[in-house]
Amino acid sequence: MRTLALLAAILLVTLQAQAELHSGMADDGVDQQQPRAQDLDVAVYIKQDETSPLEVLGAKAGVFCTCRGFLCGSGERASGSCTINGVRHTLCCRR
């Protein structure tokens, strides 16, 4: 149940960020270029004091994950995939 609540919270934050991005783009006018996929990073930080279902799946407390457009940054490793605006990207995590 906690896993479902955590995933729902992550989804809501992501959707809110995308909505703010789209409303900001509408305010800027038609002249502006749309940001590239690399600029639309979504970060997720997992912190749990006790063992959770996410830890059983491999997500450890204190891990910082970012949805990257292409390659993981220095000190990060590919830990799966994520989707932004229907485009699949690399999920990069570091401790």
Swiss-Prot record:
Its main location: secreted. It comes from the Eukaryota. GO terms for cellular component: extracellular matrix; extracellular space. PANTHER family: ALPHA-DEFENSIN 1. Disulfide bonds join 65-93, 67-82, 72-92. InterPro entries: Alpha-defensin, Alpha-defensin_C, Alpha-defensin_N, Beta/alpha-defensin_C. It is found in: Secreted. It holds the Pfam family Defensin_1. Residues 20-62 form a propeptide. It comes from Oryctolagus cuniculus. Microbicidal activity. Residues 1-19 form the signal peptide. Belongs to the alpha-defensin family. Keywords: Antibiotic, Antimicrobial, Defensin, Disulfide bond, Secreted, Signal. One of its GO terms (biological process) is disruption of plasma membrane integrity in another organism. This is Neutrophil antibiotic peptide NP-5.
